[in-house]
Amino acid sequence: MPNKKIRVLVAKPGLDGHDRGAKVIARALRDAGMEVIYTGIRQTPEMIAEAALQEDVDVVGLSILSGAHMALFPRVVQLLRDSGLTDVLIVAGGIIPDEDVDTLHEMGIRGVFGPGTRTDDIVGFIRENVS
């Protein structure tokens, strides 16, 4: 199916209640022709992994501003793997210190985008990395 739309789950793990950035990204991905499932705020890692499995997504995008990324993201990645979703592209955005980026890449988060990243850059990254 060469013209299959890329399916992206956009999720806000943890107690972070600020979702403006996630909604901007979700809109940009939709405008770029992708199918977007937005889970809303205050999602547990288990809820995110279950939604990714149920929705048969190509990409999981995690948005966080609370600083809890090093606690929450590894759990999401592990649950996705445990669910058999080993080929899903995982990306993350939000307030993520530069010193954490390499560790996030090592755990399987392929793209990490900070404040001010152009939406076109995120769209391009997803298109280039979804097989």
Feature map (PLM): residue ranges:
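N-terminal pre-triad scaffold of radical SAM enzymes
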Residues: 11-15
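Acidic, glycine-rich flexible loop/linker segments
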Residues: 129-131
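Cofactor-cradling patches in redox/metallo enzymes
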Residues: 22-127
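Short, flexible coil/linker segments at domain boundaries that flank nucleotide/cofactor-interacting
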Residues: 1-5, 85
